[in-house]
């Protein structure tokens, strides 16, 4: 299933007892629609944090004895979207065997918006408002070192089960900043800069921590070479704070056309 949602309304994607989450809201709607005794187990391609949006999240779930045929997916979508009332929008549902939204994904793409112009006061739910001028050339120089396979320990929030010296290897395919309009019209009116990053996977807080440091480069608070040096050393001490969640959105998930499976937008968002 392909989803979109405004992350400001949720405490995150993954279920949390006593808190409103994307999985919680969606699971309840599915259970009501199919008259299940309990919400199904839902797997997402990306586990977005509180406040992080998604334009192209992909999920998989096993409905067990509740058989949903390809012919009934339109009814299923209408029922879910009616119950969710725009909090989560389900764009597509397909019946596939052995599809796993997380483990079958070959890449994920995130986009981060920074508001730099007249729209600063009106964009707090969608972008990070940064009043200082930003040097995009320096930010792109700093971003170039991210492409390839690297240990991102310096730019990730370490999970409790990971030791401090354990590498967090991720393969980044692209990482660029632009002030040009993208396919969704973002930045078309000016006053925005857009960071796009695509990788095989991301560790916790990785994009927001990278953006926080790259914006510091754009402000002249860090030199571009500092990003490469931190990748090499793994040292996170005295790095800038992570960028706010509001500017971040999951905008694409790619699959190698497994079983004709979903692929988010089908290509990286431009």
Give names to the regions the model predicted.
Residues 1-270:
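Structured-RNA-binding interfaces characteristic of tRNA pseudouridine synthases
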């Amino acid at each position: 299933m392909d989803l979109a949602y405004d992350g400001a309304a949720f405490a995150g994607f993954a279920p949390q007892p006593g808190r409103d989450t994307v999985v919680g809201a969606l699971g309840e709607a599915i259970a009501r629609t199919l008259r299940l005794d309990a919400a199904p187990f839902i797997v997402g391609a990306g586990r977005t944090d509180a406040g992080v949006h998604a334009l192209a999240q992909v999920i998989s779930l096993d409905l067990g004895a509740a058989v949903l045929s390809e012919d009934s997916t339109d009814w299923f979508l209408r029922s879910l979207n009616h119950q969710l009332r725009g909090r989560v929008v389900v764009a597509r549902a397909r019946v596939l065997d052995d599809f796993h939204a997380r483990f079958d994904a070959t890449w994920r793409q995130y986009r981060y918006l920074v508001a730099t112009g007249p729209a600063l006061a009106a964009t707090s739910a969608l972008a990070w408002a940064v009043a200082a001028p930003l040097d995009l050339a320096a930010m792109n120089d700093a971003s170039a070192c991210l492409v390839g396979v690297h240990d991102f320990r310096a730019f990730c929030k370490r999970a409790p089960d990971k030791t401090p010296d354990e590498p967090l290897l991720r393969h980044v395919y692209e990482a660029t900043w632009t002030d040009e309009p993208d396919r969704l019209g973002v930045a078309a009116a000016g006053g925005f800069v857009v960071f796009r990053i695509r990788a095989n996977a991301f560790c916790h807080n990785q994009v927001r921590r990278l953006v926080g440091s790259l914006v510091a480069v754009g402000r002249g608070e860090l030199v571009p070479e500092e990003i490469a040096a931190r990748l090499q050393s793994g040292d996170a001490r005295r790095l800038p704070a992570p960028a706010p969640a509001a500017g971040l959105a999951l905008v694409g998930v790619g699959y190698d056309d497994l079983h004709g499976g979903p692929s988010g937008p089908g290509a990286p968002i431009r």
